[in-house]
Amino acid sequence: METFLRIMIPFLGTTLGSACVFFMKKSLGDLVQRSLAGFAAGVMVAASIWSWLIPAIEQSENMGKLSFLPAFIGLWVGVLFLLLLDRLIPHLHVGSEQAEGPKSRLSRTTMMVLAVTLHNIPEGMAVGVMYAGFLAGNAQITAASALVLSLGIAIQNFPEGAIISMPLRAEGESKGRAFLGGVLSGVVEPIGAVLTLLAAQLVIPALPYLLSFAAGAMLYVVVEELIPEMSQGKHSNIGTIFFAVGFSVMMTLDVALG
């Protein structure tokens, strides 16, 4: 039950962000959005290294000099999986004027919802893999580091929920429907987390591949979505500073508590 509640934390971030439509007339400030994106990116990069790639390699030590192979394969499968989704699904990233994927007549807001949903899939899977590794007794993955990852993703999801719900409200939707639209964009996260957790427990020998798959998918999201978000608009170092803060927090927890 405790694991399930922790898996729901990222979804809570989306829900709270979507609720901004009830008490805010303007979106979150640029500096706030950059800070949150930078912090989340730092957490995810550190998790990719210490929580996923290094444990994946260590669990494959019986392969000798080829112990890197499961991590290498899993990482590339994760990257290619996200690249494939990016090509197949029409979507529009925050702050971008050019839609990606196949041509579509979908509205701008709908494609923004799809962009958020698209990248929520690997985030949910990453959380599921993290808790699967912890429950499997992986010494490199602690309850604290898994919780920090959930919190880091929740922090990143907060502005995304607002980014979806507030434009829907501006287009004439009721506050309730706008809130629901933001919430629905994050529903795939707990679903993906639970399914991945169950799958990983059924195929423990495949855990190194699943861990590195999560790393590849998350690194793709960081480079494709979070780095542009923390760098857009007027020049500021705030995103970079919070990236370092997020990275340091996750690294410290992983190493100190691992």
Please provide the spans of the model-predicted regions.
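Intrinsically disordered, metal-sensing/regulatory segments
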Residues: 1-258
